[in-house]
Swiss-Prot record:
NCBIfam families: PRK05678.1 (NF004230), sucCoAalpha (TIGR01019). It comes from Staphylococcus epidermidis (strain ATCC 12228 / FDA PCI 1200). It comes from the Bacteria. The lineage of its organism: Bacteria, Bacillati, Bacillota, Bacilli, Bacillales. Pathway: Carbohydrate metabolism; tricarboxylic acid cycle; succinate from succinyl-CoA (ligase route): step 1/1. This is Succinate--CoA ligase [ADP-forming] subunit alpha.
Length: 302
């Protein structure tokens, strides 16, 4: 089992003819992802990297059976691309694009209410199910199949955590980057719920950062519902209030959203936290040993 995507997922790339999308389309194909279509208005009929290009999402879906899209469309047009994917009733749309105006995302979020399409992102690295399907911009080679789920607001910290796990012989089920913007689609609790219900996932790494209250809400949900060990890391422990730290959503405002608040809430709810990014792997190992599942997690033969 896996979460959200697997080897049977059929993917379309929105904005496929752009340079960034072309580069990552090749990377995804090399990983083994089934990319069956691309969409760029006005470029229908072209073929790039062996992938047919269509003018609309609807046409691409009808012709190829694609059920998930990944958006590499520039920020001014990305919201419309997400809405187009929702109108075509795709199962999921993963938006990589950064710098989408907050007001655009508020409209998108409202538009998606009551629809079946799940949005992951924006401003995220994507979703990868190890050794099966990679949708996004993450380095594929560090991900190896196993039993640990990863959910994160940060792209590079996801890669750091996954690399540490792999180096320790611990494989992963799925890694989900939910993005660093203040208004996004899928949240921590959505992913934790999916991991909790997934029989292959035995433990979870959750990576948050300053700003907002998503981590505190997730901590409470973990305390009340989670039946698997979860460890956490919060980025931005030295951030001054009022200064945006990289991501649009990573800002301490009105005294809320500090790293220390988040870490305290996680710890109070039974989630062990790593003090530094380099300790994420060892923190997970400690939690796994306490839960008696460490041996089960050693899925990578060295």
């Amino acid at each position: 089992m896996s979460v959200f995507i697997d080897k049977n997922t059929k993917v379309m790339v929105q904005g496929i003819t752009g340079s960034t999308a072309l580069f990552h389309t090749k990377q995804m194909l090399d990983y083994g992802t089934q990319i069956v279509a691309g969409v760029t208005p006005g470029k229908g009929g072209q073929v790039v990297e062996g992938v047919p290009v269509y003018n609309t999402v609807e046409e691409a879906k009808n012709e190829t059976g694609a059920n998930v899209s990944v958006v590499y469309v520039p920020a001014p047009f990305a919201a419309d691309s997400i809405i187009e994917a929702a109108d075509a009733d795709l199962d999921m749309v993963i938006c990589i694009t950064e710098h989408i105006p907050v007001v655009d995302m508020v409209k998108v979020k409202r538009y998606l209410q009551g629809r079946k399409t799940r949005l992951v992102g924006p401003n995220c690295p994507g979703v990868i199910t190890a050794d099966e399907c990679k949708i996004g911009i993450m380095p594929g080679y560090i991900h190896k199949k196993g039993h640990v789920g990863v959910v994160s607001r940060s792209g590079t910290l996801t890669y750091e955590a996954v690399h540490q796990l792999t180096e320790e012989g611990i494989g992963q089920t799925t890694a989900v980057g939910i993005g660093g913007d203040p208004v996004n689609g899928t949240n921590f609790i959505d992913v934790l719920k999916a991991f909790n219900e997934d029989s292959e996932t035995k433990a979870v790494v959750m990576i948050g950062e300053i700003g907002g209250t998503a981590e505190e809400e997730a901590a409470q949900w973990i305390k009340e519902n989670m039946n698997k060990p979860v460890i956490g890391f919060i980025g931005g422990q030295t951030a001054p209030p009022g200064k945006r730290m990289g991501h649009a959503g990573a800002i301490i405002s009105g005294g809320k959203g500090t790293a220390s608040e988040k870490i305290k809430t996680l710890n109070d709810c039974g989630v062990e936290t790593a003090d530094t990014p380099s300790e994420i792997g060892t923190t997970l190992i400690d939690a796994a040993k306490k839960a008696g599942i460490y041996e089960e997690l050693l899925t990578i033969k060295k």
